[in-house]
Amino acid sequence: VLLMAPSPVLAQRDLSGNWAGLYHEDQPHRIPGPELGDYTGIPLNDAGRLKADSWDASILTLREHQAKPHPSTYSLRGPANIRIRRELDPVTQETIAYELFGTFGQATRMIWLDGRPHPPAHAAHTWAGFSTARWDGNALEVVTTHLKAGWLQRNGVAHSDRATMTERFIRHGNHLMVVTIVDDPIYLEEPFIRTTNWVLSPDQDIRRTQFDVVDEVAGRRKGEVPHYLPGSPDAMRKQTEFASNYKLPAGSARGGAATTYPDGVRPLETSNRGSDPFTVLPDQIQAVHIQGNVHMLIGAGGNIIVQAGEEGILVIDTGTGPRGADVLAAIRQISDKPIRIVINTHVHGDHSGSNETLAAAGRALGGNAPGNFGLALENARILAHENVLKRMSAPSGEPSPRPFAAWPTETFFGDDKELFFNDEAIQLIHQPGHTDGDIVVFFRRSDVVASGDLFTTLTYPVIDAQNGGSVQGVIDGLNRLIDITIPKDKEEGGTYVVPGHGRLADEADVVEFRDMVTIVRDRVQDLVRKGRTLAEVKAATPTRDYDGRYGATTGPWTTDMFVEAVYRDVMR
């Protein structure tokens, strides 16, 4: 009798096959796509509405936006088909994963069933995200994290890179239903639920397409980001035109959780979203291999980059002073070769605080000591832009803020410096923005860029005006990063970017950050042109669609401080 009872494994349904989409009431949302201003049925918050109202479709003509696929939060909604293929364990022949590929999303997605954990918070994000699954009766429940920022609809309704997704794949004979639940603490008041239906269609031709970017608009200014300013005619049209055309009650087309309930009344509930894992540094310093011979250390202040090879170790930034011994121990887990070169991306102590410790633990190659300091004869060389040395040494006669042994032993004055170390060409590019001594470091063979604090995934960019920083400098630096980076496929991977703080990134993440800074700058500039004072600019909250993602009301760098820095920069 026991042998005849169905086991959970035997009860699982095979989801593999070629599937064609079935369109019902949502057909207009598939082809040609939802109308501008149609946010019906979406539990958008105020930030999500402003984000959608600001969206200008011409942004898709930018080279860095053209090849972006739809993330897995939306790719199943397109007017196309999908292929699901089983991945089998070569020994046991058990299904360990499903591979899902769609002609609309174009991002191959692996859904793992073998019990593997999700990556840590500082790992790179992708369009497909990282998906794990388990069977719950006849439904495959899938949980996806590590998603890039993308779209919930093709009319500007967005989700952030903090979004997560839960799905249930349910097969009934030749029909497949997928229930998708997207939760985004940045742009949604509550999880957004929708279903998509498919029919088995073995004869479907599902193939990958090649996409190359082109210049679609001639004469566009470098770094221009198309968007609608708040209160502009185009933004206001989104707020009124759709509801007016379809004679909908005022506000009903604007989305929001209450509009999805009978009589527009949302039941009271307690949020269970919990703390944000993306803003919490690990207790222990963690090492992550990026690619080539380049690694990233997280947890010692600013991010640290380690290049290791036969010639020794090169370190970019050194973290805070109190963590020097821990940083050195973490480096020794990567390689026991001598530390030869230390590079500072800028002057701040969270990136240069352990200079003295790491330099003393190393030794430069040969006896050549460029610059004025004999320390490089015994210790590792410390390289930085000349402005970093000026800030550390206070040559004007004031007391030096940093000990002599922490100063750069070698500097450069111009736009760049070139090294060749561990069989790899390395470019140091002076790009003032966060401070006047900022440099970007490009490992050309490993295809990894260290951005310093020109780019961070955690906060608004810190503008240190006292040390020569400027908002325009940050924007110029971000555009320079975009010029350097080349994605592998569909604006993903390829050149990886290590931010000054936060998770591993690529070009698409830099583009998202560049767009944000540029849009905020343009909004403040528009208010200044209208004669608004600083207090009035702050009251207009030009950052409110980004505050949930990058803002802060307390701490060393608040939203108010960022807005004031932008205002001061625009007023120059």
Q: Model-derived features: where do they sit?
A:
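PEST-like low-complexity, intrinsically disordered acidic/proline/serine-rich tracts
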Residues: 10-272, 368-377, 461
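Accessory terminal helices/loops
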Residues: 269-277, 364-367, 487-494, 503-572
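Conserved beta-strand hairpin/beta-sheet module of binuclear metal-dependent hydrolase folds
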Residues: 285-334, 440-452
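Metallo-beta-lactamase
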Residues: 289, 312-313, 320-322, 373-519, ...
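Divalent metal-coordination and catalytic microenvironments
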Residues: 293, 307, 317, 331, ...
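Active-site metal-binding motif and surrounding structural segment of the metallo-beta-lactamase
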Residues: 310-314, 322-380
